[in-house]
């Protein structure tokens, strides 16, 4: 299947996807740009060996049936090539999209023809071929493969409606009566294929959900067909304000293995704060180190204080939401921090978005429940949390950040901006992490590591520029405050 790399892995300006794909993130017309590329077999085996030596498990993801634009285009190009050669049987062997499909849809990213046709037998031939190739690479690397993630997210409405293969399947298979049934048909087939190979199915929350209606309105519930099948799901949608805040707990209570992956607390590609010069997305809110730190895996309602728009929420907001049962707790193997890299163009950008938030994730994943997480008295819980939070910030700022400055060549973690205000005509400043140095200037110039060190309030009329610096002299973003001297 050479088209997977010759077509699917190349990006450039084109009016169709026959030779390569149009770029999603502005990598430009040049095929030699950063938008083009792939890992070779040897590359992937090296990654597996490197990870194994460091006790890291690499879980591959084959995005299906959505987010498959490259695979669909590649196998369509293969089909066209072999049909021109008169090899109809070979051409159809790995086809992922019916040539006469008239379905009309757009993905969230505004793409068309990016969804695999789940009614084509060739779809399963292709996916089994890819699965077997992946297994072989794990064997060659002497690495363990227990599961493969088969996606399941962001499949738009309207897919398959115009597929001749789908309409034929509905006539032949009495269990496939609606478009929703195609979903269960597809993942049922994938689950069976993986079980025969000694693997279990892993995917996004959508693979464990069933669409139905309640009082005439659309309603989603955990799919009982797959519960108890040892299927594992990443559940991202606990967005406070969207209505599905209890979805992770509902799936765990129903028997699914749930990896808590909440966008509200663990999506590290979200911007640290609402500021024009802060990189990152904001569709799921803003995410600084406090949100993964105060996340309580088995009772995250308790410490949720704001909705997606930053509005205050109280415990009353979660009244009526399903809580996690003791049985459900047994179905949560862990929590996960997620960093989507499509807009990150350098290792430094990746490290900036990842650190220091990753330290808070480790605190919640590897440390037993803190006292404030289980304290029933809300006043006592708040006091315990404040004390623990202060201790954590001191440890990060005074011990962990200096380590990160030099460990493995140093990491480009985010140095936070200085907080500044005026009180009685004096300029006062503070910093999120004790241990970082606050430098300032009053001449309008950008602070450097040699500028004045802030230690006490500054009696000042006019602008003051502040910047924080770490132990090796790397600074964060500067801030300016204009003060008016008290009369």
State the predicted function of each range:
Residues 38, 42, 117-121, 125, ...:
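Soluble non-cytosolic domains of exported or imported proteins
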């Amino acid at each position: 299947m050479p088209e997977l790399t010759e077509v699917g892995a190349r990006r450039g300006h084109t009016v169709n996807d026959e030779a390569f794909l149009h770029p999603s993130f502005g990598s430009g017309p040049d095929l030699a740009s950063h938008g083009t590329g792939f890992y070779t077999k040897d590359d992937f085996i090296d990654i597996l060996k490197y990870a194994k030596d460091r006790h890291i498990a690499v879980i591959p993801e084959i995005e299906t049936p959505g987010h498959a634009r490259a695979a669909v285009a590649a196998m369509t190009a293969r089909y066209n090539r072999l049909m021109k050669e008169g090899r109809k049987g070979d051409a159809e062997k790995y086809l992922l999209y019916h040539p006469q499909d008239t379905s009309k849809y757009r993905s969230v990213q505004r793409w068309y023809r990016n969804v695999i046709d789940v009614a084509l037998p060739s779809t399963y031939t292709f996916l089994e071929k890819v699965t077997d190739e992946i297994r072989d690479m794990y064997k060659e690397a002497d690495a363990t493969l227990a599961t493969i993630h088969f996606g399941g997210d962001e499949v738009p409405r309207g897919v398959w409606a115009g597929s001749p293969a789908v309409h034929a399947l509905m006539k032949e298979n009495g269990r496939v009566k609606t478009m929703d049934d195609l979903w269960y048909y597809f993942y049922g087939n994938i689950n069976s294929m993986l079980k025969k190979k000694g693997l279990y199915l892993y995917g996004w929350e959508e693979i464990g959900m069933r669409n139905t209606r309640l009082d005439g309105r659309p309603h989603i519930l955990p799919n009982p067909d797959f519960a108890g099948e040892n299927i594992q799901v990443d559940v991202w949608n606990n967005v406070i304000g969207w209505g599905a805040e209890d979805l992770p707990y509902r799936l765990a209570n129903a028997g699914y293995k749930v990896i808590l992956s909440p966008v509200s607390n663990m999506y590290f590609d979200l911007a640290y704060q609402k500021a024009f010069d802060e990189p990152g997305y904001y569709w799921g809110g803003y995410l600084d180190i406090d949100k993964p730190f105060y996340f309580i895996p088995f009772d995250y309602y308790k410490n949720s204080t704001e909705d997606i728009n930053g509005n205050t929420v109280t415990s009353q907001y979660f009244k009526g939401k399903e809580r996690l049962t003791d049985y459900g707790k047994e179905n949560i193997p862990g929590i996960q921090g997620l960093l989507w890299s499509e807009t990150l163009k350098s290792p430094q950008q990746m490290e900036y978005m990842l650190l220091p938030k990753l330290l808070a994730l480790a605190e919640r994943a590897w440390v037993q429940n803190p006292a404030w997480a289980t304290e029933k008295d809300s006043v006592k819980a708040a006091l315990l949390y404040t004390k623990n939070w202060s201790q954590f910030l001191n440890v990060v700022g005074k011990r962990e950040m200096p380590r990160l400055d030099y460990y493995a060549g140093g990491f480009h973690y985010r140095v936070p901006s200085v907080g500044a205000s005026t009180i009685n005509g004096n300029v006062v400043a503070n910093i999120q992490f004790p241990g970082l140095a606050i430098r300032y200037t009053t001449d309008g110039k950008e602070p450097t590591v040699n500028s004045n060190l802030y230690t006490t309030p500054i009696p000042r009329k006019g602008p003051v520029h502040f910047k924080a610096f770490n132990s090796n002299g790397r600074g964060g973003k500067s801030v300016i405050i204009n003060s008016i001297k008290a009369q």
